[in-house]
């Protein structure tokens, strides 16, 4: 599991990026967020996640809010 902070997330479009210390930003789609209800993230929020290879490069999977 990796940890990082949400750089930005657009709730209307359902995606954003997670900032990883010492690494490149990672794309995150709302479908990767674990939990019930409306799936969104707040800027600066700390999260844990796995990195998988997506269609456009690395992206976050199994995202949980810390």
Curated annotation (Swiss-Prot):
GO terms for molecular function: DNA binding. Pfam families: CSD. Residues 4-63 form the CSD domain. It is found in: Cytoplasm. Gene3D superfamilies: 6.20.370.130, Nucleic acid-binding proteins. Its main location: cytoplasm. GO terms for cellular component: cytoplasm. Signal peptide: none annotated. Induction: Not induced by cold-shock. The keyword Cytoplasm applies. It comes from the Bacteria. Keywords: Activator, Cytoplasm, DNA-binding, Transcription, Transcription regulation. InterPro entries: Cold_shock_CspA, Cold_shock_domain, CSD, CSD_CS, CSP_DNA-bd, NA-bd_OB-fold. The keyword Repeat does not apply. Homodimer. This is Cold shock-like protein CspD. It comes from Bacillus cereus.
